[in-house]
Structures are given as structure tokens and as C-alpha cells.
Design a protein with these regions (language model features):
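Beta-barrel outer-membrane channel/assembly domains of diderm bacteria
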Residues: 5-131, 150-162, 204-205, 246-306, ...
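Flexible glycine-rich, low-complexity coil/linker segments exposed to the extracellular/periplasmic environment
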Residues: 339-386
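Outer-membrane beta-barrel translocator/channel fold
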Residues: 165-233, 237-242, 247, 271-300, ...
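Solvent-exposed loop/turn segments connecting transmembrane beta-strands
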Residues: 136-147, 245, 274-276
């Protein structure tokens, strides 16, 4: 008996040693980013109201990866000590994290952006992401946001892959119920059914080109209460006369091509969907303050919505230290906010599609928590990305030294469809314009160390009649918006 017990102990001990030797290697990896930027924003309402915003914002972002061998890992990303200087850290005081930004009191002590697992199954050449992570397409014109869901990346050949995914965009009225009627939330919504997104993409590489073909379908089942997650579930204001999106299909192609000294970046997409909520007026609850009414919130349409975006960026290396560039883009607009089809240019984005400093640069107050910038911010309510915008930009980048770069640009902006003057009663279809204006921008980066950069940015926007109508409803006010920005970035 003793010999048997001894043999069992030796066997168990040997097995444990064998398992310990065969166990996958566990690794902990991290990197991060610290940003502090000073903003000086002036005359964004063109003189209708006094507008002088000068403030500092900081963010410490950390990325962590817990790897268990080569085929499984847990990943998270969070932000620490984030907010406006001069505001102590405290818990949110508004309904929904994003609602804090327009009131300038965002001050998270900790905010989690990503939390997911990644695992690879070599036998089927497929990797999976499960949890909360970034969902994006192309150049981030139509989709760029963090959502909860699952996607699969299927390897095809040596370099190609197919991605398919499903994301939960909204758990209706912040309730786990899926009933069409529950007690209402702060915005009056009571339909607890959900909004979901389904995506697919094919990524390929050939020669010096990378190409992405993508498609997605979004469906919101929570519209019985005459509200839709897009746009009623957002905690920031969209431009006036925006349709509610109850379903949306998006199809597009995006890529890059390098030919000797010339680099091309391009994208084209088409959007088609429905606004099944029959609004009798433009009025709705103000997104940033649900107890108040936004008299010009909604587009009135026939239930159909559609749109498109076309984008081309060229950079040509004239010399080792000099690059000349051009950016051209066109996005669809609504030719009549009182009837007919509505216009849509995206699902949801965080504003990282960049053309200009003032007109379009509008990093939004989405859940990642980044201060709004540019005229596309929710307190000004101009366009973002290429919404009803036709843009042509000429630019140049000069490498003064290996550590110092200078960028300058001139951009002409025109509305794709006329922008109508408006009053609180609605749009004036007899008064419209297409001249949005022009902008001159400057940006310089200086590397103090290889991973520590100081940046200065400046933009001056000369408004046309159409941008005055868009923001103020009238061309009575004419001050030119301008902005100065300083940034210190430490990447580690």
C-alpha cells in the first residue's frame, strides 16, 4: 500500500512538472500616451454671442495586454486623470458620460475604453475579439467608435483577411428588458428593444496597394416611442435638421497606393437606410439637456435616407525635405429639410478624420472622453467629416530638421447642397447659399526627444454665407472663427 501511495505521489508530482514545463508562457505588456493640450477658441459663433474659450485638457492613456502564449490574450485600455485643468476629479454629474462635455466638467479619475479578449484558432485560420473594442472602417468617415461585441478575422492566403462582426450599439433605454414598453428614461423613451450592428470587410494587399472593401448593416428596434438611438440616444447635439436613423446599410472601398514619390489615400462609400419615425415637426428634446426642447432637431422626410462620401488625398515628395499635397472630398447633403429623402453620411464617428483645424476638426465627446474641437462641436453644430461639404485643399510639409516639421494648408469649402437660412419656426426655403468659406491652417511639430513632441497648431476660417446660415440661421454676424492650440505628447 505504501509503495502504491508513493508511486501515485511520484506520478502526480511528475505530471505537475510536465504541465508546468508545457504551460504557455505568460507575458504582461503595456504602453501608453500622455497628452496635454491648450486650446484658445475664438468667435466660433461669428459674433452672435461672445465666444472666448481658453482652457487646458490632459489625458494619460494606458494600454495593457495579458498574453497567455501566442494564441490568447486579454486587452484593456483606460484613461487616468483626464479632464480640464482646474477641475478636481469627481464622479459624473450628468445623465451619461458624454453629457458632461458640453458643460466642460469632464473629470474622470479612471475611464475604461477597451476591455476584451483576443484568441486565435490556428486550425481554422481565424482569430476572434470578444468584448469592448474599437470598430472602424476605411478612413473613419462612416464608422469609428468603441462598441461591445464579437468579431472574427479569417486569414485568406498570406496577407488577405475577411472580418465579420456583430456589435450591440444600444441596450434600449439603458434597460436589460426587450419589451416595447417599460418605464420611460430621462429623455422620454420607453421602447427597450435594442440597436445592433453587423459588419463585414475584405482586406487585401497587391503590389504597393492596400485595399479594404467593407459593408455593414445597422438596425434599431427601439422606435415605438418615436425616439431612435441615432440621434436621440447621443449626449451631444448634431447639426439642425438631422434625420433619425432606424436602419442603415453602408457599402464602401478604401485604400492606399504608393507609386515612387506619390502616395494616394482614397475612399468612396454609399449609404442607404430608413427613418421610419414620422415626425410632424422639427422639434425634439435637446440632447445635452433632455428637459429642454430643440426646436430644429429633426429633418422632415419621406422615410428614406441616403448619402455618399468621396475622398482623395495625394502626397508627392518633391525633395527629401519637402512634400506637396492635395486633399479633395465631397459628401452628400439634403436639398430640402422639409420633405423628400433625408441625408446621412455616417453611422457614428469620434472625429478623427482630419482635413482642417477649425471648420471640420471636431473630435467629439464620445465615450472615450476627448474635448470637442472645431465648428463641428455640439455647442456650435456645424458639419463634421464631409457632411454636405465639397472641399479642396492644397498643402505642403517641410522638414526643417530631422526633429522639426512644418505643415501649412489652404482649403476652399463649398456646400454640396444649398444651406438654408432658418428661424426657430423652421428653414427658409427662399433663402439659401452654398459658399461655406475658406481656411488657412498651420501646424508644426518639434521632437524634444524621440518620444516627446511639442506641437503648435493654428487655424483661421473665413466664413461664407452658407456657414453663417448653418450656424446662426442668418448672415447678420460676420466675425471669422480662429483657434490656437499647443500640445505636448509623450508616447511610451
Amino acid at each position: 500500500m505504501k509503495k502504491l501511495l508513493s508511486a501515485l505521489v511520484i506520478l502526480v508530482f511528475a505530471t505537475q512538472i510536465s504541465f508546468a514545463q508545457d504551460a504557455p508562457k505568460t507575458e504582461f505588456k503595456f504602453n501608453g500616451l500622455y497628452n496635454v493640450w491648450g486650446q484658445m477658441q475664438n468667435d466660433f459663433t461669428m459674433g452672435k454671442t461672445q465666444y472666448r474659450d481658453a482652457y487646458y485638457v490632459q489625458m494619460l492613456r494606458l494600454n495593457f495586454s495579458f498574453n497567455y502564449g501566442d494564441n490568447i490574450k486579454a486587452v484593456t485600455r483606460f484613461d487616468l486623470g483626464q479632464g480640464w485643468w482646474g477641475v478636481d476629479n469627481e464622479t459624473p454629474t450628468y445623465a451619461g458620460a458624454s453629457g458632461m462635455f458640453d458643460n466642460k466638467d469632464t473629470h474622470y479619475s479612471l475611464h475604461v475604453d477597451h476591455a476584451y479578449i483576443w484568441f486565435n484558432v490556428p486550425s481554422i485560420s481565424t482569430a476572434f475579439n470578444v468584448g469592448r473594442f474599437n470598430w472602424a472602417a476605411g478612413n473613419k468617415m462612416v464608422l469609428d467608435n468603441n462598441y461591445d461585441g464579437i468579431n472574427a478575422i479569417i486569414k485568406v492566403g498570406e496577407v488577405d483577411n475577411i472580418k465579420i462582426g456583430a456589435a450591440k450599439i444600444s441596450e434600449g433605454v439603458l434597460s436589460i428588458s426587450d419589451l416595447p414598453k417599460v418605464p420611460p428614461d430621462s429623455k422620454g423613451g420607453y421602447d427597450a428593444r435594442d440597436a445592433n450592428l453587423f459588419t463585414a470587410a475584405y482586406n487585401t494587399k497587391f503590389g504597393t496597394s492596400n485595399l479594404e472593401l467593407y459593408g455593414m448593416y445597422y438596425y434599431d428596434g427601439s422606435i415605438e416611442d418615436s425616439t431612435a438611438y441615432l440621434i436621440d440616444g447621443l449626449y451631444y447635439n448634431r447639426p439642425r435638421f438631422t434625420p433619425q436613423v432606424t436602419s442603415l446599410g453602408i457599402f464602401g472601398a478604401a485604400g492606399t497606393t504608393k507609386m515612387d514619390k506619390l502616395t494616394l489615400t482614397y475612399e468612396a462609400n454609399y449609404l442607404i437606410g430608413k427613418d421610419e419615425i414620422d415626425n410632424p415637426s422639427y422639434a425634439g428634446r435637446l440632447n445635452t439637456s433632455p428637459s429642454k426642447i430643440d426646436p430644429l432637431k429633426y429633418d422632415i422626410n419621406n422615410g428614406d435616407i441616403s448619402g455618399y462620401n468621396i475622398y482623395l488625398k495625394l502626397n508627392y515628395a518633391v525633395a527629401e525635405a519637402v512634400t506637396l499635397g492635395m486633399v479633395a472630398g465631397m459628401g452628400s447633403g439634403d436639398d430640402d429639410p422639409t420633405s423628400g429623402k433625408g441625408n446621412v453620411n455616417k453611422l457614428r464617428t469620434a472625429g478623427f478624420f482630419y482635413i482642417t483645424e477649425v471648420w471640420e476638426d471636431s473630435i467629439m465627446p464620445d465615450e472615450e472622453g476627448i474635448t470637442p474641437q472645431g465648428l463641428g462641436a455640439p455647442n456650435v453644430r456645424a458639419y463634421r467629416e464631409l457632411e454636405n461639404t465639397t472641399a479642396l485643399q492644397l498643402n505642403s510639409t517641410l522638414s526643417i530638421t530631422p526633429a522639426w516639421k512644418l505643415f501649412g494648408s489652404f482649403t476652399y469649402l463649398k456646400a454640396t447642397q444649398p444651406v438654408f437660412a432658418w428661424t426657430a419656426a423652421g428653414p427658409d426655403l427662399t433663402t439659401s447659399a452654398t459658399d461655406l468659406g475658406w481656411e488657412v491652417d498651420l501646424k508644426t511639430d518639434y521632437k524634444i526627444y524621440s518620444n516627446l513632441t511639442f506641437t503648435f497648431r493654428a487655424g483661421y476660417f473665413s466664413p461664407g454665407t452658407a456657414s453663417k446660415y448653418l450656424i446662426n440661421g442668418s448672415d447678420k454676424w460676420e466675425l471669422a472663427p480662429w483657434e490656437l492650440k499647443t500640445v505636448i505628447t509623450f508616447a511610451f
